[in-house]
Amino acid sequence: MQTVVSGIRPTGNLHLGNYFGAVRAFTQMQHEYNCYFFIADWHSLTTHPHPDDIIRSTNTILAEYLACGIDPEKATIYVQSDVREVLELYLYLNMNAYLGELERTTSFKDKARQQPDNVNAGLLTYPSLMAADILMHKAVKVPVGKDQEQNMEMARKFARRFNTIYGVDFFTEPQSFSLGERALKVPGLDGSGKMGKSEGNAIYLIDDEKTISKKVMRAVTDAGPTEPNSEKPEPIQNLFTLMEIVSTPEVYQHFDGLYNECAIRYGDMKKQLAADINAFCAPIRERILYIQGDKELLARVARLGAEKARESAAKTIDEVRHIIGFRPR
């Protein structure tokens, strides 16, 4: 069975974009692959979050993963900082990484531009840590978006370089894995682009009915079509895309027909869309709240995941130490 690795930074609640873009596919993949899903709390340190925020956000993502259907008996769900072997491999990969290639990565240049007063070494060596996360479990496939493709190429480069330096065929080059039809691009509510964590753009799985309604009713619209069967502007198309994802085909076709007839009332459409989003989120929201209240369950799942992840990681590190020439641990 092939190994798949995917991580998420604990920077807030999961939203509909996270669910339909990745998490829903993870619930299917856990039956087909040897899956490692981790919460990347070490990666979050580049922005210096408060300790309380790290703990809270980590437990939030863990609870939401479980509520969405990721099964700790079928997949390994763990917190990155619980697997200290990752840091050891991170060190070894950094020893083989060159300053110039790290400085040229798009992720580093973008982050340096966004936070010029906090251009730290963690940002520079982000590709090395990401590679350690992946190579630690000898992953064959890694579900990533286009924005991470350069870092995936770096991971492959680090794997090749390690093999070349030590004259071994140890690390397999991991391949980017497109979720294809399993993943849907969910648009944001601000009229353009995909759903993200920016204010007013996202609907979170934990949002209650009132919050969902308020967000949807504020979504950008226009004065309505003036010609039958006219092309939908992006903000309007975004609403229809959301409706296509969460509503029944009959509901979607009803409002699409009204739009094409120049008879649509956006207020009615938004009310229906809000109701359908709430109907989808409600059972997940209830499970999230229940799981968040069960601290023992969260601790047990994290402990189980750490044990399974460290078992895999220990094998890799022991072999890496032997290849490099270090004494056994």
Where in the sequence are the language-model features?
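Short helix-capping/linker segments at secondary-structure and domain boundaries
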Residues: L99-E103, M136-P143, S247-F255, R285
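N-terminal Rossmann-like or analogous alpha/beta NTP/dinucleotide-binding catalytic cores
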Residues: Q2-A132, R285, L289
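Conserved nucleotide- and phosphate/pyrophosphate-binding catalytic cores
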Residues: Q150, R156-R329
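Short connector loops/turns at beta-strand edges and beta->alpha or beta->beta junctions
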Residues: W42, A131-L135, G191, T248
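Internal, conserved structured core segments that host functional sites
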Residues: D110-F162, Y166, P187
